[in-house]
Amino acid sequence: MASVKVAVRVRPMNRREKDLEAKFIIQMEKSKTTITNLKIPEGGTGDSGRERTKTFTYDFSFYSADTKSPDYVSQEMVFKTLGTDVVKSAFEGYNACVFAYGQTGSGKSYTMMGNSGDSGLIPRICEGLFSRINETTRWDEASFRTEVSYLEIYNERVRDLLRRKSSKTFNLRVREHPKEGPYVEDLSKHLVQNYGDVEELMDAGNINRTTAATGMNDVSSRSHAIFTIKFTQAKFDSEMPCETVSKIHLVDLAGSERADATGATGVRLKEGGNINKSLVTLGNVISALADLSQDAANTLAKKKQVFVPYRDSVLTWLLKDSLGGNSKTIMIATISPADVNYGETLSTLRYANRAKNIINKPTINEDANVKLIRELRAEIARLKTLLAQGNQIALLDSPTALSMEEKLQQNEARVQELTKEWTNKWNETQNILKEQTLALRKEGIGVVLDSELPHLIGIDDDLLSTGIILYHLKEGQTYVGRDDASTEQDIVLHGLDLESEHCIFENIGGTVTLIPLSGSQCSVNGVQIVEATHLNQGAVILLGRTNMFRFNHPKEAAKLREKRKSGLLSSFSLSMTDLSKSRENLSAVMLYNPGLEFERQQREELEKLESKRKLIEEMEEKQKSDKAELERMQQEVETQRKETEIVQLQIRKQEESLKRRSFHIENKLKDLLAEKEKFEEERLREQQEIELQKKRQEEETFLRVQEELQRLKELNNNEKAEKFQIFQELDQLQKEKDEQYAKLELEKKRLEEQEKEQVMLVAHLEEQLREKQEMIQLLRRGEVQWVEEEKRDLEGIRESLLRVKEARAGGDEDGEELEKAQLRFFEFKRRQLVKLVNLEKDLVQQKDILKKEVQEEQEILECLKCEHDKESRLLEKHDESVTDVTEVPQDFEKIKPVEYRLQYKERQLQYLLQNHLPTLLEEKQRAFEILDRGPLSLDNTLYQVEKEMEEKEEQLAQYQANANQLQKLQATFEFTANIARQEEKVRKKEKEILESREKQQREALERALARLERRHSALQRHSTLGMEIEEQRQKLASLNSGSREQSGLQASLEAEQEALEKDQERLEYEIQQLKQKIYEVDGVQKDHHGTLEGKVASSSLPVSAEKSHLVPLMDARINAYIEEEVQRRLQDLHRVISEGCSTSADTMKDNEKLHNGTIQRKLKYERMVSRSLGANPDDLKDPIKISIPRYVLCGQGKDAHFEFEVKITVLDETWTVFRRYSRFREMHKTLKLKYAELAALEFPPKKLFGNKDERVIAERRSHLEKYLRDFFSVMLQSATSPLHINKVGLTLSKHTICEFSPFFKKGVFDYSSHGTG
């Protein structure tokens, strides 16, 4: 028995959970999984603390939520942990089952099936199974046969995923066999030879599987899928036949789901109900089986009746053996890490925890006949043993023993014969399976025989023939004749008028030709032939007078089927032609078969059949007699066994007497061995005493020698001590020299890296500029003219519709003009749809080109990275090589441009896929819907036309905004390039300073080294060493005092640095003032134009012209200030150098300050660039866009009133509120008292009559819309208004507008058109 193995796997956060800002609540440690309830406060003790976190222990816990984590578990690791056991169990003969359980979107299908780049458990298990089969068959250790089937359970109905479309697609029934358990009736089983066959069937099944998109998952499995592998293996194990059959169920379950979370309705809701029903039943089965297992383990507890509801769902019925039956089962519980799915995750973990307690009873599935052979062999071996024991005692010459030996020999011969038959059967099976050109598959209750080669199928007129004869026509020539021919014939036939060498079938490149030989009788489709004839699919061939065949050519038939599908060949005419040909051929052939000859052959066959029947009866009689003889022999063996038991009892008595005698002898032997051991111990003790004396003498001698050596070493060390001190100081100076050189080299590299970064920054901005230009070209490619034409057409249609509406209001309805206007609108939509379709094709073609370019850039980048890695590894091996060190940065510089190009292409592709193409598809879908709905009412048509006009206006405004943004970006790029040139001058000066310092340090170190060398030579001449050491110490002290003086200089440098930072802040403030002046110029230009269209058309040229005058002025001031600051800093640095700043510590401090200053300048410039990029000129011209697209009727009876939908857009924020006319009037009265400028605005007057007339309401809508636009235009320019552009700038937002007036604030009832605003 074995319990169900349970593994838990957590997936990463998906996009939906990230949008909801979900928290991570799953932690895993080895086999433990912990879930945290964030709704319970942290820090609780007792029950509340335990309720906050719950810990479960499983067989395996797989953490797959973060690929960067060291505990990350990939698909490959999951297979190695679980899949290898499944493959091993299959080869051992056990059934196995793997299924994934969890809520929808938790990663079940990914774990089981995977995706194209990362296969799941099911493909990996199949691949592992066949790889092991190939390893085994390579050494001819065993034979194998593998069948697969693939089904899905959709809405509690079983469907065969590998069957062709038929009427029985969802009508497969589930039955239960008394011994083999549940099975699916008429489920197709497919024989496979390798993993490629399995993969092909799996892909075909996955295409047919039912999936759909839900609110929680884009591709959600709407059915349970079971992929079953029936694996049979046969081999000889120690000369014993062995045949096992294993079934592997690989299950991909649909996920449990809640209707409110997925947003399911209609069919999706019904599917979800059936999915939840089967999963609830699965949970009930798991609970019941866990209770049964716990009752079985607790023997003292009272047994209770537990019912396992297998048949409550099709899923649990088919998995009956896998749950608590004959199978080794693995359950993978997939969970989400987000707190928004806490309830579903906890439920999954609890079910998985209960499944651990299920106890299965797996057994090896051995073939019944093989099992019988093995048991018979065991019985023969046992009888042989008994017979041998009996012969040794008293039955050596008895007739009973001789008779028993004879019967045993007969049984052995019979076992050998059965084994041989079993071996021949498997050899034939393997030969058929290895034949790649012939495939046998089951189709319903029938069997289909598929062949790849051209072949002949025999049409036998013998009524007693039961087989199907198929002859392959191999490449080359196939000879046909009788068995008495002089040469061996490939196809041997018998019959009237058949020559010994009759004809030849020649197959050259798939073209088959029939060549009759020397007067032989051959007919094709009833026509006698005497020369080579080309054969076509379906031809009927007669050889002689009695051998008829049908010729099949699979490739030619496939081509004909394709033609029939494409309409080139009518199926009706093709079938009638085939029928007529078959009828003519058969009738022509029957002319050659006389009735008498047929009756004679039939009588001969009946006589043969009668003789065979008699032979069978004789064999049955013989078998009965053999069976009776075997029973008699078994009775004799039983009596012999009883006699043998008596003899064995006598032998045991004799063995006991022998044991007593041997015990006495062993005691004597032990006494002798004890005396011998005593003697050996005395001899060893004497030897040890002699060795101890010898060892003491050796130790004393060794100590004396060691003392003498120690004295000599001390003398030698005293002589070397003074020399060692000098060398140590020399090494210390050398180290300091190397450190100084290393630091200077680092400074040089830092300056070079700064230069590269600045160049890359300029290149990046240039890339952005080019990207924006191409993006605008992409959007403007003929679209502006097209949009303007459509807008003009829509204005004409709208005028016609308004005339019809005015005529209807006056009581004079013109139906013909309404119909013409609607026809014009529909014709406009058709033209628009055609243009959209053409544009979609262009975009799709452009998308393919971009994908191809991205793939090429990725390949180039991978090649460059591989070369860079190889050179890096070579540099690690050869660090001392100076020439190799410069090659790696050069390779890195090659990689950077390729990465930028790749990022640019990917951004282009992403913009096309996420923005342009979806917008186009949405517009095309809207056009389709309008055309499908047909003619609309006047109001609906007018609403659609006005909506289209508003969209066209927004598109034109967007095009103008992109053009303005491109001009701004180009100005920013020029500004940044100018800054980069000034930075280049600063870096050159800094490099010159570093080189001069490096030269001074090198000279100082060379002088110190020369002094030490002189000291060493003086020591060699035995001069006074103490004076030299004291002199060097005094020099070092003087150096230390010099360093203290340099610290004062360092303080002054820091003060200068602070002053420099203050000047830079002043510079930034001046730049900000210049930008503010540009914004004010934009505001002045905007005041000169009345309408939105006029502003967009006429304000772009003056603003750009003014900006072009201001930008050079701003650049000139910045350049002058930077140049002045550079010169001042260089003078300060030269002054510090002249005063003696030469030590390494001070040098490093200065360089660090220089580096920090450069970084600060760079960050400051980047901030200025980012600000300039973030400011959209079009947004500053028209930051608030407001419109009233429609009005709706709310309330009933006396409370009925019209509400206007007000759509407000502030920069990139858009929202909608519904307000009635009285709210507009209240806002105007309230704000008019605060801001006098509003009194000059014209507010739509109140009317006593006609307030519910739609014509009046339509006019009021346009008046209110104009009022709101004028209202914001005044407020943005008013100095007393909180919305003034100089006060808010880019901080203008939805919050600012709502704080200005509650009229624009969205209330509780503003989320639909049924509010009371």
UniProtKB/Swiss-Prot annotation:
The modification Phosphothreonine is found at residue 577. It is found in: Cytoplasm, Cytoskeleton; Early endosome membrane; Cytoplasm; Cytoplasm, Cytoskeleton, Spindle. Residues 1036-1057 are annotated as: Disordered. PROSITE patterns: KINESIN_MOTOR_1 (PS00411), KINESIN_MOTOR_2 (PS50067), PX (PS50195). GO terms for molecular function: ATP binding; ATP hydrolysis activity; microtubule binding; phosphatidylinositol-3,4,5-trisphosphate binding; phosphatidylinositol-3,4-bisphosphate binding; phosphatidylinositol-3,5-bisphosphate binding; phosphatidylinositol-3-phosphate binding; plus-end-directed microtubule motor activity. GO terms for biological process: early endosome to late endosome transport; endoderm development; epidermal growth factor receptor signaling pathway; fibroblast growth factor receptor signaling pathway; formation of primary germ layer; Golgi to endosome transport; receptor catabolic process; regulation of receptor recycling. One of its GO terms (cellular component) is early endosome membrane. Changing residue 1225 to A: Induces a 3-fold decrease in PtdIns(3)P-binding. Residues 478-529 form the FHA domain. Changing residue 1229 to A: Induces a 3-fold decrease in PtdIns(3)P-binding. Primarily expressed in brain. Also present in kidney, liver, intestine, placenta, leukocytes, heart and skeletal muscle (at protein level). ATP binds at residues 102-109. Residues 1182-1296 form the PX domain. Residues 370-425, 595-882, 936-1087 form a coiled coil. Residues 3-358 form the Kinesin motor domain. Keywords: ATP-binding, Coiled coil, Cytoplasm, Cytoskeleton, Endosome, Lipid-binding, Membrane, Microtubule, Motor protein, Nucleotide-binding, Phosphoprotein, Transport. The modification Phosphoserine is found at residues 398, 582, 1052. Changing residue 772 to T: In a breast cancer sample; somatic mutation. Residues 1036-1048 have a biased composition (Polar residues). Plus end-directed microtubule-dependent motor protein involved in endosome transport and receptor recycling and degradation. Regulates the plus end motility of early endosomes and the balance between recycling and degradation of receptors such as EGF receptor (EGFR) and FGF receptor (FGFR). Regulates the Golgi to endosome transport of FGFR-containing vesicles during early development, a key process for developing basement membrane and epiblast and primitive endoderm lineages during early postimplantation development. Belongs to the TRAFAC class myosin-kinesin ATPase superfamily. Kinesin family. Interacts with RAB14. Interacts with PTPN21. The PX domain mediates binding to phosphatidylinositol 3-phosphate (PtdIns(3)P), phosphatidylinositol 3,4-bisphosphate (PtdIns(3,4)P2), phosphatidylinositol 3,5-bisphosphate (PtdIns(3,5)P2) and phosphatidylinositol 3,4,5-trisphosphate (PtdIns(3,4,5)P3). Does not bind phosphatidylinositol 4,5-bisphosphate (PtdIns(4,5)P2). This is Kinesin-like protein KIF16B. It comes from Homo sapiens. The lineage of its organism: Eukaryota, Metazoa, Chordata, Craniata, Vertebrata. The gene is KIF16B.
